[in-house]
C-alpha cells in the first residue's frame, strides 16, 4: 500500500492505495492532460457515499474493464 496526502474541498486527507492503482490514476490524468489532484477531485465529487479509496479503485476498474 502507498499512502498519499492531498487536499480536497479545502481539507487535507490521506488515501492508501496499491501502487498499481496510483499508476493507473496517474496514467489517466496524463491522458486527459490534467493534474492527478484534479482527476481525484472529479472522482471525489461524483462518488455516492463510498469511501474515497473505494471510489478511486472503482473508477480505475471502469477504465480498464473490457467493453463488449
Where would I find each of the regions flagged by the language model?
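C-terminal structural segments of small proteins and small subunits
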Residues: 45-68
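Residues at secondary-structure transition points
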Residues: 12, 16, 34, 47-51
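Aromatic side chains
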Residues: 11, 21-22, 64
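Residues in the helix-turn-helix
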Residues: 14, 38, 55
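Short Lys/Arg-rich basic patches
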Residues: 1-16, 26
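Surface-exposed, Lys/Arg-rich phosphate-binding patches that contact polyanionic backbones
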Residues: 20-45
Amino acid at each position: 500500500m502507498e499512502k498519499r496526502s492531498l487536499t480536497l474541498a479545502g481539507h487535507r486527507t490521506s488515501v492508501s492505495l496499491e501502487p498499481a492503482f496510483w499508476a493507473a490514476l496517474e496514467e489517466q490524468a496524463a491522458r486527459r492532460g490534467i493534474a492527478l489532484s484534479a482527476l481525484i477531485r472529479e472522482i471525489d465529487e461524483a462518488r455516492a457515499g463510498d469511501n474515497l479509496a473505494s471510489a478511486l479503485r472503482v473508477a480505475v476498474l471502469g477504465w480498464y474493464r473490457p467493453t463488449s
